[in-house]
Regions:
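Short, acidic Ser/Thr/Gly-rich low-complexity loop/linker segments typical of extracellular
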Residues: 58-77
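Short acidic/polar inter-strand loop motif in beta-rich domains
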Residues: 99-112
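Beta-strand signatures of extracellular beta-sandwich domains
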Residues: 49-55, 94-96
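Short amphipathic, basic-aromatic surface patches that mediate peripheral association
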Residues: 1-43
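Short Pro-Gly-centered beta-turn/loop motif in secreted/extracellular proteins
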Residues: 44, 78-93, 100-101
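Alpha-helical segments with a strong preference for the paired helices of cellulosomal dockerin domains
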Residues: 139, 146, 156-183, 192-215
Length: 215
C-alpha cells in the first residue's frame, strides 16, 4: 500500500502475535510483478492494512464477535475485506482498530445505524479510555481538527500490567530498522519507505503513552 517504488507485501501483516489472524484475505493484493500470490494492485488511495474487531455487549476482549483485516484509505475510511456479521440490532457494540505501528483505538458504545449497519468516526472525538488516574493514559491524539492514533508503537505485545504502551522497546524496533529504505518495516513510523531520524521523532513525541484497552 506504500509508494510504488518497491514491491509491497501481498496480503496483510497480522498473521503473527498478538493478532494471530491466519485468514489469507487480501493475499491477492500486492505488486503483481514481484509477488506470485498477488493478482491485483492496491487501490491508489490505500495507505496500509489495519485490523478491525467488534465487541458486543461490553468492552471486554471475550465479547469479540468479529475480527477482520481492512484497508485504510487516505481519507481515513476503512474498507473491510470480510463479509458483514449478523447480530441483534438492539445491542451495543465497541469497534477496535489496530495498526502495526500505532497504539490501538476503541470506540465508545455505538449501535447499528437504523438497525442495519455499524459505523464510527474516530476523527471527531477522543476514543475509549479506561479512566485510570495515570496521567499517561491516552485514547487518541488531538492533531489539528482531528483525533488520530498515536504512532511509534512498533512493538505490539500486550503487557497485563501496563496494557499497550510506547516504551524503549519501540525505540529498539526503530533502531533495528534505521537506515533501511524501500522496505515495508515496523520501524518506519511515518511510512515513507525511508527509516530515519524522523521516525525516531514519532517515538520521542509519543513515548510513555499508555492505553488499557482490554486484551
Amino acid at each position: 500500500p506504500l509508494v510504488g517504488v518497491t514491491p509491497t507485501p501481498a496480503g496483510h501483516p497480522y498473521t503473527g502475535s498478538p493478532w494471530n489472524y491466519t485468514d489469507i484475505l487480501g493475499i491477492d493484493y500486492g505488486d503483481v510483478a514481484a509477488n506470485p500470490d498477488a493478482t491485483k494492485p492496491y487501490p491508489p488511495d490505500v495507505v496500509d492494512w489495519v485490523f478491525v474487531s467488534v465487541r458486543q455487549g461490553d468492552s471486554l476482549a471475550s465479547s469479540t464477535i468479529f475480527r477482520c483485516v481492512g484497508l485504510i484509505h487516505t481519507n481515513g475510511l476503512i474498507t473491510i475485506e470480510c463479509p458483514c456479521f449478523r447480530s441483534a440490532g438492539t445491542d451495543k457494540y465497541y469497534i477496535l482498530v489496530e495498526h502495526r505501528s500505532h497504539l490501538p483505538v476503541m470506540s465508545h458504545v455505538t449501535k447499528l445505524n437504523g438497525g442495519t449497519s455499524l459505523s464510527y468516526d474516530f476523527t471527531t472525538s477522543n476514543s475509549w479510555k479506561l479512566g485510570t488516574p495515570i496521567p499517561q493514559e491516552v485514547g487518541q491524539k488531538h492533531k489539528g481538527a482531528y483525533w488520530v492514533m498515536y504512532g511509534g508503537n512498533g512493538d505490539q505485545q500486550y503487557n497485563s500490567s501496563s496494557g499497550f504502551d510506547l516504551n524503549s522497546i519501540d525505540f529498539d524496533v526503530w533502531t533495528d530498522d534505521n537506515g533501511n529504505v524501500f522496505k515495508y518495516l515496523k520501524g518506519d513510523y511515518d511510512m515513507n519507505l525511508d527509516c530515519n531520524s524522523l521516525d525516531d521523532d514519532f517515538w520521542i513525541n509519543n513515548n510513555g503513552r499508555i492505553n488499557f484497552i482490554p486484551r
